[in-house]
Amino acid sequence: MKKVYLLDTNIVSEFSRDQPNPNVLALYEERKDLCAISAITWQELIFGVTKMPEGKRKTYIKKCIEEFKDDFEIIPYDGFAAEICGQLCGRSEQDGKTLPYLDSQIAATAIANGMVLVTHNVADFEEASERSFLRVEDWFDVA
């Protein structure tokens, strides 16, 4: 089945919280077969857990991340996404703006694969949305 939604790191992290956002959980359950994560999100998850101090929380998060790996297709950051990212960042810099690099890579992955980016950090992706065909949804704020 074609994946439609690319989940940002803050959405995936929600699943490991003690009290996850009910809207995020409900929409994920409804659409989980259509969801994937980017290789960049996978990198951010691994980085986050690796730098945590040893303890019960780190052990729990590591377990969650391993389950994520089984639950989500990981969409690679490929040459086409790199080209899109380079264009987005280059155009932004021409206008005196800087796009966050990892967010730019995640946005470019979504664009390259014709996917909707699901994030709670909509503001981080506004510049990319204005300069491209990036579609963004915030599952926290579903009416």
Where are each of the predicted segments found?
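Short, well-structured N-terminal submotif of metal-dependent ribonuclease cores
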Residues: 1-38, 50-66, 143
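Acidic, PIN/NYN-like endoribonuclease modules and their adjacent C-terminal/linker elements
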Residues: 1-4, 107-143
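Generic structural signal for small/hydrophobic residues in well-ordered secondary structure
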Residues: 8-9, 45, 85, 110, ...
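Alpha-helix capping/helix-boundary segments
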Residues: 11, 41, 81, 106, ...
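Nucleotide phosphate-binding site architecture
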Residues: 12-13, 43-46, 126, 137
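Residues that scaffold the ATP/ADP-binding catalytic core of kinase and kinase-like folds
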Residues: 14-15, 48, 85, 128
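Short, hinge-like loop/turn segments at secondary-structure boundaries
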Residues: 53-56, 92-93, 134-138
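Active-site neighborhoods of divalent-metal-dependent phosphate/nucleic-acid chemistry enzymes
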Residues: 73-116, 120
